[in-house]
Design a protein with these regions (language model features):
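Residues located in well-ordered beta-strands
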Residues: 11, 23, 37-39, 101-104
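Generic structural signal for individual residues within well-ordered alpha-helical segments
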Residues: 13-16, 25, 87, 177
Length: 201
């Protein structure tokens, strides 16, 4: 519900896996989805998500399931990464094509997992939807897009990363999300995306 209007009605798992827009994406899940300014680039036969100094090779199955992504190559979009898709590279696998580096600002050991807050070389997405969502869930409104983004990851409980260190994390690119920064809509099927752009309501 946003400003009295239903945003999406579906099973909880569908809302989590395939949110219609930025508002739903950020509302479902805790901690909230990380949202970064970015773009897509072609790399050989594949696609790479680029956000500042971060480069993440996209899983081919993901690209095949979301044909609308092809029309966004080279244009701005918003990249969504859920915290549970980010893990300690020393434990989950050190794949340089899916890696991000950042300074550890905060480490929260929760027993079954470690919540790690990383300052990364990217810009946090700042839109009206993102600001409104932060207010609704009682969080801090995002700062300037010129600031380094803070990304939250759910690390394995055995992770040894410590505050003030530079940590390497690996991203499960099979579960990335993408949004049109102009409409806030999720980028999925070509036909669905076209119809939503013509009629945002």
């Amino acid at each position: 519900m946003r400003k009295g209007e239903l945003q999406q009605v579906d099973a909880p798992q569908v809302l989590y896996d395939r949110p219609d827009n930025l508002f739903v994406a950020g509302f479902i899940g805790s901690p909230a989805m990380n949202l970064l300014e970015g773009k897509l680039e072609r790399d050989g036969n594949g696609l790479v998500a680029v956000a500042g100094g971060l480069r993440l090779a996209l899983d081919r199955e993901l690209v095949g399931a979301r044909p609308a992504l092809a029309s966004f190559v080279g244009t701005p979009l918003i990249i969504g990464i859920r915290p549970e898709s980010i893990d300690d590279a020393a434990i989950a696998g050190d794949d340089p094509r899916r890696q991000l580096r950042g300074e550890v600002l905060l480490r929260e050991s929760l027993g079954s997992e470690v919540m790690v807050h990383l300052s990364v070389d990217a810009r946090q997405a700042v839109t009206d939807e993102v600001r409104e969502l932060a207010q609704d869930i009682g969080g801090e409104a995002p700062g300037s897009a010129d600031q380094r983004a803070i990304v939250v990851g759910r690390f394995n409980a055995r992770s040894r990363v410590q505050t003030a260190q530079t940590a390497r994390a690996v991203v499960d690119t099979r579960s990335l999300h993408f949004f049109d920064p102009q409409t806030g809509l999720g980028i999925y099927d070509a036909e669905a995306t076209d119809s939503k752009e013509l009629d945002p309501s």
